[in-house]
């Protein structure tokens, strides 16, 4: 019964919002360039699907590449911080400071320094995705039981074996929690980069149709962005279940 309610209630709210939106636009005859109706947005999505997919491929390349690089860097830095308290004390404050810098300030600088091709967009994605992964994984590594580590040491385990047997599997839940957040950020990061400097991508396409006051196409583009963000998040969840199936099962128990 509770499961049905969890599905039915959000679905009901969705139907009411979309229905009310459609009714409002039709009754008050709102212009397309001010607020398109949901039916117009769906029509624009279907009619421009091929174009949207072409731009999606560009955005996905930037997003996935940035996410992979930021994950690698976050894992590396997190392990270094876990190994050395001095290193953590030295670098942790700067990780916090990076999150206070507006991405709209860095974007133009990256474009000036690195041009208008793939690199500046990937750097923006890395900048947005690195922090949640690094912080979540670092915190998870620091919470590993000392008893388990000491037990392995008593059996003669070296540092590599301790990380392989205990620390990485135990810290994986933090790593994937950060990855799920980053997976939703990465598409947004690529879009911001494309707004600032690009020749293709969903951000570039959105800016172009927005300047032409084609708001139905703007909303269609937003739907594509939401779709890819959710898909990447689900991909990370699936990867977690494949690599560490015990994690969520252990939580439920």
Positions of the model-derived regions?
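Transmembrane alpha-helices
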Residues: 123, 127, 160-192
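Periplasmic/extracellular loop-to-transmembrane helix junction in inner-membrane transport proteins
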Residues: 27-68
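Transmembrane-helix boundary motif in ABC transporter permease subunits
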Residues: 65-95
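Non-cytoplasmic
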Residues: 178-229, 237
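C-terminal transmembrane helix and the adjacent membrane-cytosol boundary/short C-terminal tail
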Residues: 85, 177, 219-253
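N-terminal signal-anchor transmembrane alpha helix
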Residues: 5-27
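Short cytoplasmic-facing helical segments at TM-TM junctions of multi-pass membrane proteins
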Residues: 140-175, 206
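Generic hydrophobic transmembrane alpha-helix motif, especially the helices
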Residues: 96-132, 139-140
């Amino acid at each position: 019964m509770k499961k049905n309610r969890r599905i039915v209630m959000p679905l009901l709210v969705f139907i009411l919002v979309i229905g009310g939106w459609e009714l409002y636009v039709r009754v008050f005859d709102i212009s397309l360039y001010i607020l398109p109706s949901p039916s117009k947005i769906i029509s624009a999505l279907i009619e421009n699907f091929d174009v949207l997919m072409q731009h999606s491929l560009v955005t996905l390349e930037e997003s996935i590449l940035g996410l992979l690089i930021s994950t690698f860097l976050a894992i590396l830095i997190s392990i270094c911080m876990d190994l050395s308290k001095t290193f953590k004390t030295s670098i942790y404050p700067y990780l916090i400071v990076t999150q206070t810098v507006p991405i709209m300030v860095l974007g133009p600088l990256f474009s000036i320094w690195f041009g208008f091709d793939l690199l500046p967009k990937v750097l923006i994605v890395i900048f947005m995705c690195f922090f949640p992964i690094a912080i979540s994984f670092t915190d998870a590594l620091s919470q590993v039981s000392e008893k388990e580590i000491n037990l392995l040491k008593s059996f003669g385990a070296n540092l590599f074996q301790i990380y392989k047997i205990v620390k990485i599997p135990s810290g994986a839940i933090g790593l994937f929690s950060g990855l799920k957040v980053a997976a939703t950020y990465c598409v947004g990061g690529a879009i911001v980069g494309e707004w600032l400097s690009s020749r293709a991508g969903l951000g570039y396409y959105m800016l172009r149709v927005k300047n032409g006051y084609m708001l139905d196409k703007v909303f269609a583009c937003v739907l594509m962005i939401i779709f890819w963000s959710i898909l990447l998040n689900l991909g990370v969840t699936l990867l977690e279940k494949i690599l560490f199936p015990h994690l969520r099962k252990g939580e439920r128990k």
